[in-house]
Curated annotation (Swiss-Prot):
InterPro entries: Elp3/MiaA/NifB-like_rSAM, Methylthiotransferase, Methylthiotransferase_CS, Methylthiotransferase_N, Methylthiotransferase_N_sf, NA-bd_OB-fold, Ribosomal_uS12_MeSTrfase_RimO, rSAM
Protein name stated in the entry: Ribosomal protein uS12 methylthiotransferase RimO
Key word Metal-binding present: yes
Bridged cysteine pairs (disulfide): none
EC number, UniProt record: 2.8.4.4
NCBIfam families: 30S ribosomal protein S12 methylthiotransferase RimO, MiaB/RimO family radical SAM methylthiotransferase
Transmembrane segments: none
Source organism: Vibrio cholerae serotype O1 (strain ATCC 39541 / Classical Ogawa 395 / O395)
Cofactor(s) demanded: [4Fe-4S] cluster
EC category: transferase
Family membership noted in the UniProt record: Belongs to the methylthiotransferase family. RimO subfamily.
Amino acid sequence: MTVQTFTPNQTTTLETAKKTIAEQSQNSQTTGNKIGFVSLGCPKNLVDSERILTQLRTEGYEIVNSYHDSDVVIVNTCGFIDSAVQESLDTIGEALKENGKVIVTGCLGAREDEIRQVHPNVLGITGPHAYQNVLEHVHQYAPKPAHNPFTSLVPDHGVKLTPKHYAYLKISEGCNHRCTFCIIPSMRGDLVSRPVGEIIGEAERLKNAGVKELLVISQDTSAYGVDTKHSLGFANGSPVRHNIKALSEELGKMGIWVRLHYVYPYPHVDEIIPLMAEGKVLPYLDIPFQHASPRVLKMMKRPGQAERTLERIKKWREICPELVIRSTFIVGFPGETEEDFQILLDWLKEAQLDRVGCFKYSPVEGAAANEIEDQIPEDVKQDRFERFMLVQQEISAAKLQKRIGSTMQVLIDEVDDEGAIGRTYADAPEIDGLVYLNGETNLKPGELVNVVIEHADEYDLWGSVLHDAQ
């Protein structure tokens, strides 16, 4: 059984909601009622979709790739920003028009009244990570088929919506923070960490299935284990603490790429950097700083010591010179002055971050930031966004120019009749840069190759494979 994903063109400047249609290979035998599935939003939502699909396949349902062939369509929604809400509502409407039998889940599902007001005819609505409730709705409108263990086989690692060579590994659910621009805690609740043994077991199954890269995700990755008071757990019979350092050490033993995402800038993040220097996890840190002005950070309810953060970044790079830092920022936050924005630009120039995404602030229903006075006009937001990205573009271009002439390991993502496309340790899938290998048509997705970097632009690299070195 194979799973393919379909995503729209991605950019490195804005992480918008992404639509994923689940498609099972056509040589799978029909084993029961047919389910269509649309997944919207972030990688954390994608993992929820994978879990639902895995359970459906385990129960004998067939997953199909068209509205017309589906007995029921499930839409896993995103509700983080207004544009994501609109995309979710539009997708629900499309599914109702094309099929008529729709079950809604995901973050927007936590706002049932809003969905019912626009689409009163949906069959059922559940909130995020309400897997059992989704299945109950499916059972009601598409009863369980007769289960045949010989035609309903599901791989040990479950159904995945990513390419075979990388997978998202979700380590916790929810968040204890109350950032004023965010409503995730109201939809997904407070932090709940997965047992460490369960996480390691899933990671091992993924590795055994051919996964070469694990992307560790959650709402707040560095808070892993806080809710358990960092209690002692067990993985493969050995004691392991429920904290991000111990978990990273265990994942690092597997001999595949381990990439940490959504790391909140707690002081104990400093403890992870030596693991990166030792090669146990990738020297890549996705850490959303959001802003640099102390005044704006205070309004956001984010850590406000920007100068201290610069000192930490300097120390991290001294410990691990190869460290790549990715971050996201919000411009046009309510009350942001030109002086605040200039502080951000100056900080960005000083920090010299490798990869950066930027959002123009968008009001989110229920967010505390909506009550802040001095909402910023859209034209000012756009101007600041463009100025911000111009500064970062220059930083990124200069950093990538320094890669020319070096040899880097590249993980191949795609191959066609023109060549191959891959990524270095410095680039996460879909949100960062790419490495183009023109003419390399004999490579395979998931293959690791050594590449001499020959050319660079603002975000991407071009190079040639060192075949003798393989």
